[in-house]
């Protein structure tokens, strides 16, 4: 797993809780995997793992594959889940989530 410091059992439980389509809630997921209690540096490391193209932003296509960063066999997010995730994180309205927006979303 590419997220050092997260408990594998917590990650597995968080993934199991959102296997059904439209059951993903990013706030609940962040809390279950333990990201919400991590340091700012750890949150930034998580951001850079999710930012697959290394653009400095998490775009909609990267959000769709969010769960697969935690487990290759996890499902893709639905369009509705992806749009809700993006809408909550994208505070400046540029259609992407920057590292500070991501940190605020996890800690919020």
Curated annotation (Swiss-Prot):
User: What's a GO cellular component annotated to this UniProt protein?
Assistant: axon
Q: Where is the EF-hand domain?
A: 38-73, 77-108
Q: Which Gene3D superfamilies match?
A: EF-hand
- Could you name the domain of life of the organism this protein comes from? Eukaryota
N-acetylserine modification sites?
2
Task: Tell me if Repeat is a UniProt keyword of this record.
Answer: yes
Write out the residues that bind Ca(2+) 1. 51, 53, 55, 57, 59, 62
Swiss-Prot/TrEMBL keywords: Acetylation, Allergen, Calcium, Metal-binding, Muscle protein, Repeat
Q: Which PROSITE patterns match?
A: EF_HAND_1 (PS00018), EF_HAND_2 (PS50222)
Binding-site residues for Ca(2+) 2, renumbered to this chain = 90, 92, 94, 96, 101
From the UniProt record, list the coiled-coil ranges: none
Q: Which GO terms describe its molecular function?
A: calcium ion binding
Question: Tell me, what does this protein do in biology?
Answer: In muscle, parvalbumin is thought to be involved in relaxation after contraction. It binds two calcium ions.
Q: Which family does it belong to?
A: Belongs to the parvalbumin family.
What name appears for this protein in its UniProt entry?
Parvalbumin beta 2
């Amino acid at each position: 797993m590419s997220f050092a410091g997260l408990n594998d059992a917590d990650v597995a439980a968080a993934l199991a809780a959102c296997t059904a389509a439209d059951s993903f809630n990013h706030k609940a997921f962040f809390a279950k995997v333990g990201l919400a209690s991590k340091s700012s540096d750890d949150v930034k490391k998580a951001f850079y793992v999710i930012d697959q193209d290394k653009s400095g932003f998490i775009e909609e296509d990267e959000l769709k594959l969010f769960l697969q960063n935690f487990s290759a066999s996890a499902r893709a997010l639905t369009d509705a889940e992806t749009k809700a995730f993006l809408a909550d994180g994208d505070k400046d309205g540029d259609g992407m989530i920057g590292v500070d927006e991501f940190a605020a979303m996890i800690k919020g």
